[in-house]
Amino acid sequence: MVPSDRDRVLAEAGVSRETAAALDLYVAQLTRWQAIKNLVGPATLPDVWTRHIADSLQLLDAAPQARTWLDLGSGAGIPGLILAIAGVRNRPDLRVDLVESNARKGAFLQETARLTGAPARIHVARIERVVAGFRGVDVVCARALAPLPQLIAWTAPLLKSGTIGLFPKGREAQSELTAAREKWTFVADVIPSRTDSSAGIVRISSLSDPLP
């Protein structure tokens, strides 16, 4: 029997039965709320386990020691809520903060975090306001939110103080890195995506002040 996308993703991730059940609940919530609020691209919902679950889970391996995460523009909880659901079973001290300015999407995040028991705090606010009050977070991440130069501008106070940035990108990764280097000095690498051969996770660290 050919395994389903769900079974394959869960097997590759090596999650517990409890985590699998929590991720199933997340997918059920996403499907239910999708009819009310367009949380993800409709064409991606049939491939939710690869396009969204597996694509999010690979970020855990990009920062294996991280305990505190800040997810910007979380929307449907991708990747932040998925990371919180999956990561807490192996990392009891994990904490994920999700930032989403849309109130209805924020309501989805609140309800789904409660139902799944995810260690997530939801901030229904603008990114600039939340980032200004954060220090000491291990990782800041964002998927499908903005070009890399804008992401760096939003997160500069964190990246300059030791936080690592993890930003999934598609074919535009290298061109966005080139544009960002015209404004900032930083260390970067691109981790190949496991779910899309044309995509990668841009990892940013050691940011310094903008170039003159």
Swiss-Prot record:
InterPro entries: rRNA_ssu_MeTfrase_G (IPR003682), SAM-dependent_MTases_sf (IPR029063). GO terms for molecular function: rRNA (guanine-N7-)-methyltransferase activity. Its EC number is 2.1.1.170. The keyword Phosphoprotein does not apply. The keyword Cytoplasm applies. It catalyses: guanosine(527) in 16S rRNA + S-adenosyl-L-methionine = N(7)-methylguanosine(527) in 16S rRNA + S-adenosyl-L-homocysteine. S-adenosyl-L-methionine binds at residues 73, 127-128, 143. Keywords: Cytoplasm, Methyltransferase, rRNA processing, S-adenosyl-L-methionine, Transferase. Transmembrane segments: none annotated. It comes from the Bacteria. Its main location: cytoplasm. One of its GO terms (cellular component) is cytosol. SUPFAM superfamilies: S-adenosyl-L-methionine-dependent methyltransferases (SSF53335). It is found in: Cytoplasm. Pfam families: GidB. NCBIfam families: rsmG_gidB. Specifically methylates the N7 position of guanine in position 527 of 16S rRNA. Belongs to the methyltransferase superfamily. RNA methyltransferase RsmG family. This is Ribosomal RNA small subunit methyltransferase G. It comes from Methylobacterium sp. (strain 4-46).
